[in-house]
């Protein structure tokens, strides 16, 4: 079984935040090393500094590449300038440079087939900006680098509670003009496919939230529901995608109606993430769906306010590891099923004789 362990590439994120703390705390539990082979892309020197400062009992090996990572060990690939300094809670362009270097190396080794999935620790979206990185965040960067032309979908999840976003990191004033029928349909299709292939749900039920208060109140508070969202949903229903709504976000979330669906599609960032984080901040996971690569991250940021104090909970990061493993395994099973589709055997009655007929499962 050892050779079948999933190799998880972990990017260090912002070295002045809680990234190393949650990584080291997660893998201080020996049972985590039985599930996967974790490889940190970062700095052994920085990792050792965090380990000592936070008094975390986690050992690691230094390797040149993920191909050298040993079983039942946490490994660190050095891809950061040894002179970089850790200054807890301080936004620093050098820390941003180190975060980008780790991300680039992880992507490079993923392309080489040395790791199976990527789990990213939080970055500072300001200090990482450079000529090489001009994106709002991880999601858009990874879509550009590893998407192969596919569009991504941001999903925040905890167990069966999954919230996806039509629009992500854009100003509120641009939301209404950005949302189109085509964009909603694109996100619904990705969400539907993800729920089936990545989470093994046979017939996913998706709830769609409205853009305007009270779902537009019959046009009194806006026409986007009537002119964009509902027509988009009707066309998707004709293609076999099960979607309901649009629901007013406040009543839908406040009533607990979200528990009756496999996924919820929100129109914009805070509409989806505010209730999600209120309900599942501690161990929620950010999953980037729709791409060939499996990428997850914890649902929190750099948490500068508690960096270096030993107060950060590793629960969300641990769940990000679990989700990456589960999705990768589900995709492998899906791939195997497509290569060797199950065959149905049934008898067809003809002229008082039974004829064995073989049929293959629809490949969707």
UniProtKB/Swiss-Prot annotation:
Substrate binds at residues 138-139, 277, 286, 295. Its main location: cytoplasm. GO terms for biological process: pyridoxine biosynthetic process. It comes from the Bacteria. Its cofactor is a divalent metal cation. SUPFAM superfamilies: Isocitrate/Isopropylmalate dehydrogenase-like. Catalyzes the NAD(P)-dependent oxidation of 4-(phosphooxy)-L-threonine (HTP) into 2-amino-3-oxo-4-(phosphooxy)butyric acid which spontaneously decarboxylates to form 3-amino-2-oxopropyl phosphate (AHAP). Homodimer. The gene is pdxA. InterPro entries: PdxA_fam. Its EC number is 1.1.1.262. It catalyses: 4-(phosphooxy)-L-threonine + NAD(+) = 3-amino-2-oxopropyl phosphate + CO2 + NADH. Belongs to the PdxA family. GO terms for cellular component: cytoplasm. This is 4-hydroxythreonine-4-phosphate dehydrogenase. Keywords: Cytoplasm, Metal-binding, NAD, NADP, Oxidoreductase, Pyridoxine biosynthesis. The active site is located at the dimer interface. A divalent metal cation binds at residues 169, 214, 269. The lineage of its organism: Bacteria, Pseudomonadati, Bacteroidota, Bacteroidia, Bacteroidales. Binds 1 divalent metal cation per subunit. It is found in: Cytoplasm. One of its GO terms (molecular function) is NAD binding. Pathway: Cofactor biosynthesis; pyridoxine 5'-phosphate biosynthesis; pyridoxine 5'-phosphate from D-erythrose 4-phosphate: step 4/5. Coiled coil: none annotated. It comes from Bacteroides thetaiotaomicron (strain ATCC 29148 / DSM 2079 / JCM 5827 / CCUG 10774 / NCTC 10582 / VPI-5482 / E50). The keyword Iron does not apply.
């Amino acid at each position: 079984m050892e050779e079948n362990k999933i190799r998880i590439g972990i990017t260090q994120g912002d070295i002045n935040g809680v990234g190393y703390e949650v990584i080291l705390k997660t893998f201080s539990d020996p049972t985590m090393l039985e599930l996967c082979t974790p490889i940190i892309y970062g700095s052994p020197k920085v990792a050792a500094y965090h380990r000592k400062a936070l008094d975390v009992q986690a050992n690691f090996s230094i390797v040149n590449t993920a191909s050298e990572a040993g079983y039942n060990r946490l490994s660190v690939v050095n891809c950061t300038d040894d002179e970089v300094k850790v200054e807890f809670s301080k936004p620093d362009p050098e820390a941003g440079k180190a975060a980008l270097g780790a991300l680039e190396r992880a992507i490079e080794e993923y392309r080489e087939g040395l790791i199976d999935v990527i789990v990213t620790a939080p970055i500072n979206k300001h200090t990482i900006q450079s000529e090489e990185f001009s994106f709002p965040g991880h999601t858009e960067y990874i879509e550009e680098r590893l998407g192969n032309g596919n569009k991504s979908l941001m999903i925040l999840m905890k167990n069966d509670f999954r919230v996806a976003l039509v629009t992500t990191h854009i100003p509120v004033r641009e939301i209404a003009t950005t949302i189109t029928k085509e964009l909603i349909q694109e996100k619904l299709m990705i969400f539907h496919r993800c729920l089936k292939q990545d989470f093994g749900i046979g017939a996913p039920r998706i709830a769609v939230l409205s853009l305007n208060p009270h779902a537009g109140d019959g046009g009194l508070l806006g026409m986007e529901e009537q002119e964009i969202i509902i027509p988009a949903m009707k066309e998707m229903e004709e293609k076999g995608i099960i979607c309901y709504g649009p629901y007013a976000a406040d009543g839908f979330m406040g009533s607990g109606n979200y528990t009756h669906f496999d996924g919820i599609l929100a129109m914009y960032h805070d509409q989806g993430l505010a209730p999600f984080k209120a309900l599942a901040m501690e161990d929620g996971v950010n999953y980037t769906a729709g791409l060939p690569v499996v990428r997850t991250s914890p649902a929190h940021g750099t948490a500068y306010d508690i960096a270096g104090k030993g107060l950060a909970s590793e629960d969300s990061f641990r769940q990000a590891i679990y989700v990456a493993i589960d999705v990768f395994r589900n995709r492998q099973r899906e791939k195997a099923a497509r290569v060797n589709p199950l065959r149905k055997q049934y008898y067809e009655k003809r002229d008082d004789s039974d004829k064995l007929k073989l049929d293959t499962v629809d490949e969707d």
